[in-house]
Amino acid sequence: MEINKYLRQSKYSQTLLINQASLTRAENNQTVYKFGFGQSPFPVPTEITKALANAAHRKEYMSVQGHLPLREAIVNFHQQQENKHWHSDNIIVGSGSKILLFCVMAAFEQAEVLLPAPSWVSYAPQGKLAGHKVTWLTTSFNEKWQLTAPQLDEYCQNRTTPEIPLILVFNYPSNPTGQTYSAKQLSALAVVMKKHNIIVIADEIYSLLTFTNDYSTLEQFYPEGCIVSSGLSKWCGAGGWRLGFMHIPPQLNHLLNTVVGVASETYSCAPAPIQIAATTAYERLDVANSFLTAQRKLLNEISLHCTTQLQNVGVMVHPAQGGFYLFPEFSAFSEKLTKHGINTSEQFTLAVMEETGVALLPGSAFGMEESSLTARLAFVDFDGEQVFDEQINEYNFEKVKDGITQLCVWLAKL
């Protein structure tokens, strides 16, 4: 039996692998600092879990495009939170934003998928599963791991296959870097995107966890070619509920129809009870606002602590601007690491895990060269329940502090 070559090339997700390694270490009663898996530490607010419990009896198939009251709630929510002007007809709901990303890619018979390196681990495998060419556009520490307009323009102008459609998957705040883009940067990028007719999937799953109030979106500058992807998993702490959505602009209605068709032949619809509960999540702006304020405050505090400690021992790292992640570069230690037989990011993260119990994900999992001594650090190994305790004056994230200390001590002793 011959397996499809794209499926044959597909590997198990690196994030899930590191999570399994962490669990195995913990089962052997060894200390592990789970900085490898970017799952929200915050519990789903009680009002929303009650809505799910009350909807448990809902067993019907819903519209492939999504429950209309949910789509309307999403539109209103993002208008209030981010001043977006959408219509429910242009929203499609799915079982997580991940499957919707794949549905968009699968809608194209042939395309080239552009990814800034580093980017989230699943974008490239999805592009390959859809049968497309995947091209990495490598970024640098000095550019804050961000794609620049001149870089994108230069690549597009020198393409050898200009007839093939371009899809750029663009995530901000970024997983894995924690960095986001300014309005000036997005405006410059939009000029290039329009020039080369690029269809952009703007993955804004972390947008509501931006630490400041000046969050900008590509959609402001390129509404006709920008698909926005988001969902419940990060801001609402409901990753396992698998509820995501996309806004596909009216100018791409033909693509929306195709994506709905792909959805109908794959997951059919998001589960009815989850859609009902999600409607409550998007309708309860009061709950969302207080929850988001507490999350942002705690995440920013932890990010700054981790950044300061790492910088103090010579690690190159930018403080996060949103989300759960830092993307430190350890090139300052390259000579010392080489003496220990460590020359790749994978070797580095394996050594760190074995010698300190700190679980990191190698930069190579995010499209960086294997020789790049980078890693993603997810600073979410703490009790998120505390954000609901109104009596708390000071947040507790001692395990994160301990893990960072272990990593810094290990580096200092190299």
Residue ranges and their predicted role:
Residues 28, 130, 195-196, 313, ...:
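Helix C-cap/helix->beta junction micro-motif
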Residues 296-307, 311, 317-336:
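Conserved glycine-rich beta-strand-loop-beta hairpin in the small C-terminal domain of fold type I
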Residues 227-297, 304-310, 405:
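Conserved core segment of the aminotransferase class I/II
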Residues 106-170:
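PLP-dependent aminotransferase-like
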Residues 338-342, 351-360, 366-414:
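PLP-dependent enzyme catalytic core of the Aspartate aminotransferase-like
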Residues 3-95, 284, 383-386, 414:
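N-terminal small-domain helix-loop-helix segment of the aminotransferase-like
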Residues 115, 136, 200-202, 362:
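Hydrophobic residues in well-ordered beta-strands that form the structural core
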Residues 141-213:
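Active-site phosphate-binding strand-loop segment of PLP-dependent enzymes
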